[in-house]
Amino acid sequence: LYSGMALGIIQLILMLFLSSLILFNQNYDQSFLINKSSITRFPKNNLISVLFYLVVFYFFIPFLILIKGLSNFNAQLILSTGFLNSISNSMLISILSVLLAVFTSLSALFVYRSFLEKNSKLHKSIFISITILLFIPSLTLSSIIFYLNFNLNFIFSNFLIVSVINSFFITPIVFVFLSNKFIQNYLYESKQCLLLNISPFIRMVKIDMPKIKNELILIISAVFVLSLGDLTSVTIFNDSSFRTIPLFVSQLYNNYKYDDAFFILSIFIIFLFFIMYFPSRFLNRNA
């Protein structure tokens, strides 16, 4: 726990430091262009440039996993039952989690906009109730839902519980990302729908969905990747028969099979890259 907190703090500090360096370089370039007519020109600070590239290299380290993993290619591991079950579990969980998150987010956005159109202050409660999930630790939320299922004598399967937990994590991300575009011109649209007698369902299908189509494709691909990489909700079950890709890699590490773990990670990274690449490619083609 302390190691994880320390690593998170270090990464946060490095990200803030990197951002400050970028802003410093931009401001320096702008000031240099403004004062380029002056006779004396001061060179850039070499130390800042070195620190900048060191921080960039730090965040580039995960990509070295690709080189390490692909150099330990193992065809038998890819065709093994454990890996195939893990990838199928991960895909099914992510698909169901994304569907639940998108449905919940669109429903919440619909209610949120309805309160805005009625000039009701209840829209704030909708926004807070969704976004507060961002501030609840993943382990806490997973434990609460697991405990509820325990009191119900485990009537829900592990697959469904993990999917619901993941959907809680990604729902506020989808909600916040789509909210600005979804409520855009809501007063004008509301008046036109009243004049033309357009039902809320038709408005959602014919007006809202085309309006947020591009943003929806991007955020679905992003949260799908996030759901694939989640490990917290799976580990609380302590069930070796129910494995996802992150748990499969973790078990390889625990068994000191580091080469196999790096190889699976490299395959997983390439797979995630294509998941993010094809939606962006589709949007660029239709732009």
Model-derived features with residue positions:
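Short cytosolic juxtamembrane segments of multi-pass membrane proteins
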Residues: Q30-I39, E117, E189, S240, ...
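Short helix-to-coil transition segments within interhelical loops
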Residues: F115, K191-I212, N254
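Membrane-water interface segments at the C-terminal ends of transmembrane alpha-helices
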Residues: A6-L23, K44-S71, T81-I183, I207-K211, ...
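Surface-exposed acidic loop/strand-edge motifs in secreted or periplasmic proteins
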Residues: N74-A75
